[in-house]
Every structure is written in structure tokens, then in C-alpha cells.
């Protein structure tokens, strides 16, 4: 008898090697922060206005050196009738760190172009913009929003307000059902 041949089972087809993982998508580039060149801003305020602004500026000087910290700039801007967001204030300051906000100081001459830049910004919301924004919360379509819901929105969304600020803003605005006529509310806010 002939010797048995080793019958080998055909080798199982090797599984195809997994395709290499695709290269990770490059991280999206951060949008370049627009720098505001304060030296290029033309001061359009009258001498009298500048004197009034300086007087207000100096009220915030805590050390008597005719300077304020960067963290006070937003307060002074708002005291002078502008209404910049915190982001706009940081942008006009050159996006300083939190440490710099409390440590760095500026003089009135450095502040004035910042005030002019903020004053020139025409991106402020209009009455219609605010009413339209609040209409989203008008579930019944009757011109009112729930006071509790508005409190929550003001304290948690966008430029968050402190609870005391919300209460001061909403004082006397709610009806007996806890609802607020948002058109009257916007008129009230814009008159402050």
C-alpha cells in the first residue's frame, strides 16, 4: 500500500487587512479675532462730552492715580450710556486674560478710543428685535410670557444676569397670573 499523503486542508482565506483608519480631519481653524486698532479710531466727541466722560471715568478710580482696571471698563462704558456685551468689552480691550483684567490699568486717554469704538457699533438690538426674541416664549400667542420662564432665560442664557439684577429688572412687571406683557416689558427696559 502506498503511503498516505498528508492531505492538508486548504488554508482559510486570510481576512483582508482592515483599511487604515482615515486620517483625522484637521481641527477647524479658530476664527481669527478681529483686532480693533484703537490708534486708528477718530474721536468724534465734543470737548464738553469728553470732559463729562472723564469726570465719570474718574469716579471709578479707586487709587487716585487717574486710572481704572480693565475689569472696570465695561462698567464705565455702561455708565456712559452704551450697552456693550461682555464679549464686546473684551474685544475692545484686546481679549485680555482674567488676570490682566484685574491687574492692568488704563488712563482716560486710552479709554476714550474704546468708548468711541463701542459708540460707533450699530449692532445694538432694536425694539423689534427684542420683541421678536421674546415672542418665541409666547406659547399662547397672547402677547405675554410667563414671568418664571423669563427669569430663567435671563439668568441662564446668553449674557447671564445675576438673580438680583433679574429681580430689579422685572419688579412690577408681572400681572396677577405671573405673566408679563413682553412688548411693555421691552419698552420698560429700553427706557431705563
Curated annotation (Swiss-Prot):
Residues 17-29 have a biased composition (Pro residues). The modification Phosphothreonine is found at residues 69, 85. Keywords: Acetylation, Methylation, Motor protein, Muscle protein, Myosin, Phosphoprotein, Repeat. Residues 1-34 are annotated as: Disordered. GO terms for molecular function: calcium ion binding; structural constituent of muscle. GO terms for cellular component: contractile muscle fiber; myosin II complex. Residues 48-83, 125-160, 160-192 form the EF-hand domain. PROSITE patterns: EF_HAND_2. InterPro entries: CALM/Myosin/TropC-like, EF-hand-dom_pair, EF_hand_dom. Transmembrane segments: none annotated. Myosin is a hexamer of 2 heavy chains and 4 light chains. Does not bind calcium. Non-regulatory myosin light chain required for proper formation and/or maintenance of myofibers, and thus appropriate muscle function. This is Myosin light chain 1/3, skeletal muscle isoform. It comes from Oryctolagus cuniculus (Rabbit).
Amino acid at each position: 500500500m502506498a503511503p498516505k499523503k498528508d492531505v492538508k486542508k486548504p488554508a482559510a482565506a486570510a481576512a483582508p487587512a482592515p483599511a487604515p483608519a482615515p486620517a483625522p480631519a484637521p481641527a477647524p481653524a479658530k476664527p481669527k479675532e478681529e483686532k480693533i486698532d484703537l490708534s486708528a479710531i477718530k474721536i468724534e466727541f465734543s470737548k464738553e462730552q469728553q470732559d463729562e466722560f472723564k469726570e465719570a471715568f474718574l469716579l471709578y478710580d479707586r487709587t487716585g492715580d487717574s486710572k481704572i482696571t480693565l475689569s472696570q471698563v465695561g462698567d464705565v462704558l455702561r455708565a456712559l450710556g452704551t450697552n456693550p456685551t461682555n464679549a464686546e468689552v473684551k474685544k475692545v480691550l484686546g481679549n485680555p486674560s482674567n488676570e490682566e483684567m484685574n491687574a492692568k490699568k488704563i488712563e482716560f486717554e486710552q479709554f476714550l478710543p474704546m468708548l468711541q469704538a463701542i459708540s460707533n457699533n450699530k449692532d445694538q438690538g432694536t425694539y423689534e428685535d427684542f420683541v421678536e426674541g421674546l415672542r418665541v416664549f409666547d406659547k399662547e400667542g397672547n402677547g405675554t410670557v410667563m414671568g418664571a420662564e423669563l427669569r430663567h432665560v435671563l439668568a441662564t442664557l446668553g449674557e447671564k444676569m445675576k438673580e438680583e439684577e433679574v429681580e430689579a429688572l422685572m419688579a412690577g412687571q408681572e400681572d396677577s397670573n405671573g405673566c408679563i406683557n413682553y412688548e411693555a416689558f421691552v419698552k420698560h427696559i429700553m427706557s431705563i
